[in-house]
Amino acid sequence: MKKFLLPLLFAFILTSVSAFSQTIDYDKLAPHPRLLINKGDIAAMRAFRDRSENARYVNDMIVNEATRFLSTSSAVRKLEGRRLLQVSSEVLKRVFYLSYAYVMTDDVRYAERAEREMLAASEFIDWNPSHFLDVSEMTMALAIGYDWLYHYLSEESRNKIATAIYEKGLRPSENDKWAWFFKADHNWNQVCNAGMIYGALAIMDRSPEYCQKLIEKCLKSNPIAQICYEPDGGYPEGAGYWDYGTSFEVMLVAALQSALGTDAGIAAQESFMRTASYMTYMATPSGKSYNFADSGSAMSCISSKYWFARQLNDASIVAVDELFVKNRKVLNVRLLPTYMVFGSALDFSKSQLPDNTWVNHGATPVFVYRSGWESSDDTYFAIKGGSASTNHAHMDVGSFIYERDGIRWAIDLGSHNYHVLEEAGLDHGNTKQESVRWQIFRTGPESHNILMFNGHLHNVKGLAEIVETFDTPHRKGAVVNLTPAFAADAKEVIRTAELDKNDDLTITDHIVCGEEPATVEWRMATNAEAKIISPNTIMLKQDGKTLYLKFKGKVKAEAKIWPDHNYREYETVDKNLRRVGFVLQLKANKRVDIEVTMSGARNSA
């Protein structure tokens, strides 16, 4: 746990321990099905499908994919490097989709195919407990299938599947070497505890004492992960891992509600209940995500957000997601059936679109501005603080993205394939100061929209905080204190990002140089064609549109287009990438304000 989070964690635990230690009445265990749904919920999902065009579209996606699974072979135990996760995730998707298709259609072909998939997985020698995410997703897969298809399955199949859940799913959590997730403060805690709780709830009739003790252990562990949402619903690991960690957190609490009639106090945590909004603002007008840290750029309707909407009785939480569905921006992800589970309880008639600005603080503060929500040409700007030592973080404090007129001008490259890096022998998960992680182009500083001093790495433990925001008709933006990240080279670095009434963007960096002279690089990554048209102006062109970057300050600067990166053999080559910016020389102790303005009009740039 990082030092700056310790006071927050202590306060959080003091206020939440009683909520999370609620006494659970296991005598209230519901009959099968009890994971996510009870018997009456099937009729509600069918009614939702029949009354809603969006629900009908999602339902048909799931059923069509389940139909495709009918002609596929069952998964086999094949590791990718040290992981079985791809296999476990695929089994979860297949079993969940097939089980859903069966309860919605009563077509036994889907149940039979899900049964074959579960029996095949039950025969695996193990579910790869050395990488426990693999165990957890496989356990959840078989738990859902066992529960939803309970009355279809033969006694022999039930016994085989339940035994596999117990022996290959739950029992490995007794090994401290494998089950370190119980003490983790990130997505592993959420995913792994969810898998264990699903397995325990599914087979509790068979081993009630064991399953109850395991559930209590998981619920004692889970609050550690809840700190990540403090103080206001942000998520430190970025959009990709929000979707992973939070979706499984939702799966966990929703199963407790349906099986035992309790949320175990999880829904009482204010910061957690605000976090759905975070993902709303990670969606950009181009239909992509703000993909900082180890995140991909894909974005679509996120079904776990519908649990928050159901819990808070506020369909506005998913108004943007409903637009995604309307525009057919839905991905066939493994937890998609929860859209139908949670959405069936919502009334969308009074749903409203969100405000145009958002800010969260905590471990990775982010400010977001959108000019609107219904056009791909809307302007989007986001800037982040944080530190490089956060789980899955890049060396990118002060970085930003900027979309305008349907183009993402300032980009983030996102994550690199983990397996490829591990095959090359790289300890890419190490976030210490001298880690090889910072030599990888996508995770190191040189690919991001940041400042660099003397070519040095940022201080990985330096926390950059958002210290001010503003939102008026003529001025929107945020101020980020970057000083802790540059402590070795500068006495003060404050970045102010401001959009005017025309959505032109100005980045102002207030710098007080350190005791030694410094070469300062102002960097931005883009997919646009780039041309230097004056010593202080760069012209970008993409898709027939133009954006000008103009430098202004009481110090001489050199406009620069950096040469293509010399990729190592294990690195993904980023096609059409240009790195543009300005280079300036500062004397020791020099105090200076530099501005870079981005505008479609050259004379106002």
Summary of predicted features, one role per range:
Residues W180, I203, Y244-W409, F470-R475, ...:
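Carbohydrate-active enzyme catalytic cores, enriched for enzymes
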Residues P31, D134, M138, C192, ...:
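Residues that flank catalytic or metal-binding motifs in active/ligand-binding sites
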Residues P7-S16:
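Bacterial N-terminal signal peptides
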Residues A19-Q22, E322-N327, V420-A605:
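CBM-like, beta-strand-rich accessory domains located in the C-terminal region of large
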Residues V135, N189, W242-G245, A268, ...:
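Active-site-proximal structural scaffolding
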Residues D27, P33, S371-E434, I440-P445:
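Terminal accessory carbohydrate-recognition/targeting modules of carbohydrate-active enzymes
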